[in-house]
Amino acid sequence: MESLSLSHHFLIAMPGMGDPLFAKSLVYLCEHGEHGAMGLIINKPSGIAMAQLFDQIDLPLDDEDTRTGLVYFGGPVQPDRGFVLHQPAGNWQSSLMVTDDIALTTSKDVLVAVSEGKKPEQLLISLGYAGWSAGQLEKEIADNGWLTVPAEPSIVFDLPYEERYDAAMALLGFDPSLLSSDVGHA
């Protein structure tokens, strides 16, 4: 039996998520397969502005809108490493194609392009990522830790971070206040 891939899906933390790192988190899943899963938390700013990040990596950044943009806390794994989620996908040295139009890039060339004003149309930069070993995410979903729904790029790239969690919840089509964090069997 072939397992269902949740790549290009949102993971929505259930109300009552016990882990404070993931409480009220919205994760964009970039990869999901038999070896595990990885994604980026897309609604938690890291407290670092793009200008600070680019200063740290010695790249100029003159575009004021980009300078004031937020860098996100992508998750607890490799928190000192940058991950750039963007569309269109483009042609970068180290990219994971999530969809035909969305990629996750970890190579510095995409940051150099941002510095030079040649950035992808839409991007989200995070430090760190969220990762799950084989079967771990499936268990967390079965234990009512996460809700899943196909991702909408407009939520990732167009909405303010404060609105992303509720917008993803709205994709489910029901009132999240009706959810219980209690696990049980009917």
Curated annotation (Swiss-Prot):
<protein>
    <recommendedName>
        <fullName>UPF0301 protein CV_3909</fullName>
    </recommendedName>
</protein>
<dbReference type="InterPro" id="IPR003774">
    <property type="entry name" value="AlgH-like"/>
</dbReference>
<comment type="similarity">
    <text>Belongs to the UPF0301 (AlgH) family.</text>
</comment>
<dbReference type="GO" id="GO:0005829">
    <property type="term" value="C:cytosol"/>
</dbReference>
<dbReference type="Pfam" id="PF02622">
    <property type="entry name" value="DUF179"/>
</dbReference>
